[in-house]
């Protein structure tokens, strides 16, 4: 159990988990206040109104476990929570019985019935929070919204405001050790957002870049943080024991073997593209813009290469440590 506690503490530190001191404030549900916010609808006056998203450690762990259970298939779930000013607070989450593929999730009638029954039963046991968003996984290709995701989120924001979309990459979570997660809200149709600075760089596979580029200006990311309290510590410990055993008994080198191979192939294609563009650029004089674009692609490919290498080394180090802990036989006595 000591090892489990250390692993849990490491996970909390890796994801910058904050312990809430004023427990009653964040866990108390003020129905009147929430109704006043819903009536005022401040997000209709400012399309960039919500800026922050807070997730409870319990909701986060449930989402990560669900996403990991799907493997290479996308999974989907719903989140319960409330609004506090410009912050969307996610208190809990639950999985939905949906059909998933490697590129999308499809919610059928049974999923909507399950959703309604779950929320109703949650209220009967004192969980008064409403549905505040949905989550789904992007196994191996990062946290962003595809064209289908943008359409789904736009529809949700049209009829179920306030609503947020959360994307988790379980494959990169296993590789990096830190939860790879993003929270997003879409802009209304026809709205042109102001030019923003460059967002944090993330590796996008070559076959997804077009989908990413076409829709990247139709939504924005919220600043994500995580919190916990002594109230949910016991539940978190019980849930962690299952998560920790799965993590300890698995190897990212084996679990993510296909992902790593795909990363290497994707990287080789990006390098070939960059090399071809640089080659063409050498025959064209005075086209500095073309050269800069080629060099930019080469720089991104270099960053992707470093990331893949670090993740592979991280997985190898984990295997060596586990081998030393569990498989080494003391031969000095022989």
UniProtKB/Swiss-Prot annotation:
Q: Where this protein primarily resides, as one coarse class?
A: cytoplasm
Underlying gene: cops5
- Name any one GO molecular function: metallopeptidase activity
Recite the other comments: The CSN complex is associated with some 'Lys-63'-specific deubiquitination. Such activity is however not mediated by the core CSN complex but by the brcc3/brcc36 component of the BRISC complex.
Q: Which Pfam families match?
A: CSN5_C, JAB
CDD domains recorded: MPN_RPN11_CSN5
Q: Which PROSITE patterns does this one have?
A: MPN
> What does this chain do?
Probable protease subunit of the COP9 signalosome complex (CSN), a complex involved in various cellular and developmental processes. The CSN complex is an essential regulator of the ubiquitin (Ubl) conjugation pathway by mediating the deneddylation of the cullin subunits of E3 ligase complexes, leading to modify the Ubl ligase activity. In the complex, it probably acts as the catalytic center that mediates the cleavage of nedd8 from cullins. It however has no metalloprotease activity by itself and requires the other subunits of the CSN complex.
A GO BP term here is: proteolysis
Q: Which UniProt keywords apply?
A: Cytoplasm, Cytoplasmic vesicle, Hydrolase, Metal-binding, Metalloprotease, Nucleus, Protease, Signalosome, Synapse, Zinc
Protein name per Swiss-Prot or TrEMBL: COP9 signalosome complex subunit 5
């Amino acid at each position: 159990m000591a090892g489990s506690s250390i692993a849990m503490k490491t996970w909390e530190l890796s994801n910058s988990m904050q312990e809430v001191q004023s427990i009653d404030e964040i866990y108390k549900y003020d129905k009147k206040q929430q109704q006043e916010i819903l009536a005022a609808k401040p997000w209709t006056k400012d399309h960039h109104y919500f800026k922050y998203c807070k997730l409870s450690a319990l909701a986060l762990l449930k989402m990560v476990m669900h996403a990991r259970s799907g493997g290479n298939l996308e999974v989907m779930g719903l989140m319960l929570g409330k609004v506090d000013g410009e912050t969307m607070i996610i208190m809990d989450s639950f999985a939905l019985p949906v059909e998933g593929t490697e590129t999308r999730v499809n919610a059928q009638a049974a999923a909507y019935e399950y959703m309604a029954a779950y929320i109703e039963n949650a209220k009967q046991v004192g969980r008064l929070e409403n549905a505040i968003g949905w989550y789904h996984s992007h196994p191996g290709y990062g946290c962003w919204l595809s064209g289908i995701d943008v359409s789904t989120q736009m529809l949700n924001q049209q009829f179920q405001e306030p609503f947020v979309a959360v994307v988790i990459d379980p494959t990169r979570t296993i590789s990096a050790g830190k939860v790879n997660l993003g929270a997003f809200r879409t802009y209304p149709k026809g709205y042109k957002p102001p030019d923003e600075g460059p967002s944090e760089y993330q590796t996008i596979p070559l076959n997804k870049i077009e989908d990413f580029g076409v829709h990247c200006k139709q939504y924005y990311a919220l600043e994500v943080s995580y919190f916990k309290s002594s109230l949910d510590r016991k539940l978190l410990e019980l849930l962690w024991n299952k998560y920790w055993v799965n993590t300890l008994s698995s190897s990212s080198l084996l679990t993510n073997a296909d992902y790593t191979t795909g990363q290497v192939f994707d990287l080789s294609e990006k390098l070939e593209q960059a090399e071809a563009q640089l080659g063409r650029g050498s025959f064209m004089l005075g086209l500095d813009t073309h050269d800069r674009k080629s060099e930019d692609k080469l720089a991104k490919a270099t960053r992707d290469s470093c990331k893949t290498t670090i993740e592979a080394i991280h997985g190898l180090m984990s295997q060596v440590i586990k081998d030393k802990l569990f498989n080494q036989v003391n031969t000095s006595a022989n």
